[in-house]
Swiss-Prot record:
The lineage of its organism: Eukaryota, Viridiplantae, Streptophyta, Embryophyta, Tracheophyta. One of its GO terms (biological process) is photosynthesis, light reaction. It is found in: Plastid, Chloroplast thylakoid membrane. Belongs to the complex I 23 kDa subunit family. InterPro entries: 4Fe4S_Fe-S-bd, 4Fe4S_Fe_S_CS, NADH_quinone_OxRdtase_chainI, NDHI. It is an enzyme of class 7 (translocase). [4Fe-4S] cluster 2 binds at C74, C104, C107, C110. Binds 2 [4Fe-4S] clusters per subunit. This is NAD(P)H-quinone oxidoreductase subunit I, chloroplastic. Gene3D superfamilies: 3.30.70.3270.
């Protein structure tokens, strides 16, 4: 008879303990009802990024001196810098600059150590594509067009038109 009574007492204690734990969980749930939502409705609302957010890298072709510091400080040697040595002026001329954001770890070393500040981090974080090769950005996709305004075909056409030569 005594083991039966202790069994009922243990069962009762376990029941009370379970009810207390359920009540604690319910109280935590109720305490969250007055709080603001943590999630955002992504396509319709944009995430407000902090000042130091490391998003897509912006590149300014005109400022780059092809020193390749960005390649040396990158942990994965990611930026591809193609340049040509101009022998008459003994300077490097930048031909092509590209970064593959499918491989980039967004550490920011290239931006931090660039001597001419031609690289900067933007707030852009949407990189969704169906093909991973679309994540390889060249200098045109990274920033401004790498051609001077006078070399542009549209500008040359306008400058060579007879109407502009009259005025």
């Amino acid at each position: 008879m005594l083991p039966m009574i202790t069994g009922f007492m243990n069962y009762g204690q376990q029941t009370l303990r379970a009810a207390r734990y359920i009540g604690q969980g319910f109280m935590i749930t109720l305490s969250h009802t007055n709080r603001l939502p943590v999630t955002i409705q992504y396509p319709y609302e944009k995430l407000i990024t902090s000042e130091r957010f490391r998003g897509r890298i912006h590149f300014e072709f005109d400022k780059c001196i092809a020193c390749e510091v960005c390649v040396r400080v990158c942990p994965i040697d990611l930026p591809v810098v193609d340049w040509k040595l101009e022998t008459n002026i003994r300077k490097k001329r930048l031909l092509n600059y590209s970064i593959d954001f499918g491989i980039c770890i967004f550490c920011g070393n290239c931006v931090e150590y660039c001597p001419t500040n031609c690289l900067s981090m933007t707030e852009e974080y949407e990189f969704s594509t169906y093909d991973r090769h679309e994540l390889n950005y060249n200098q045109i996709a990274l920033g401004r067009l790498p051609m001077s305004v006078i070399d542009d075909y549209t500008i040359r056409t306008i400058l060579n038109s007879p109407q502009t030569k009259k005025g």
